Regions:
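PLP-dependent aminotransferase-class I/II
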Residues: 65-130, 137
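A glycine- and small-aliphatic-rich helix-loop capping segment at beta-alpha/alpha-beta transitions
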Residues: 50-54, 74-82, 140-145
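Beta-strand segments within the central parallel beta-sheet cores of soluble alpha/beta enzyme folds
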Residues: 13-16, 59-64, 123
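Conserved PLP-anchoring active-site segment centered on the Schiff-base-forming lysine
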Residues: 51-73
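Catalytic PLP-binding core of fold-type I/II PLP enzymes
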Residues: 118, 136-149
Length: 149
């Protein structure tokens, strides 16, 4: 607080130092950006994925939590509550968001194929340990299967 004030919205020298250290430890990291929350990181990931791929659709694992942004609230629910967690979000916001069943690579593959005719898939969001904070674990090889698709 003494050095930079109460707002961390602007870059700070320590962000640069951290980015440099991460690049040294993980040479494949070409760019690095600090963000304020996981929600913000997921929102940025959607935007960067769409920019990088030129595609518009996002597919996410059903029941998985990826922050509170409107588009990623689809499929975020406590079992038995329908879409209670996404109340207040107009349905049109989910036009380019789909979900697939956890542990079901065939369901994901089907959605990827369909999206080839609907503007392509920009990104697939998963929780590698399983949805609902890993209370519904997925097979240990599931993330590799997603990556292969």
């Amino acid at each position: 607080m003494d050095d930079c004030g109460p707002s961390t919205g602007l870059f700070h020298p320590y962000e640069y130092k951290l980015a440099k250290k991460i690049s040294e430890c993980v040479p494949s990291v070409e760019m690095f950006r600090m963000l304020g929350s996981g929600t913000e990181a997921c929102m940025c990931a959607v935007r960067v994925a769409r920019l990088a791929t030129g595609h518009k659709n996002i597919i996410k694992m059903g029941g998985a939590y990826h922050g509170w942004s409107d588009q990623l609230a689809w499929g975020m629910r406590v079992p038995g509550t329908l879409n209670l967690q996404s109340h207040g979000v107009p349905m049109f916001v989910f036009k380019h968001t789909q979900e697939f069943f956890p542990n079901d690579l065939k369901d994901l593959e089907k959605k990827l194929i369909i999206n080839k005719f609907r503007g392509g898939t920009a990104a697939v969001f998963i929780e590698p340990c399983g949805p609902e904070s890993a209370t519904r674990p997925v097979d240990k090889d599931f993330p590799k299967g997603v990556q292969a698709l």
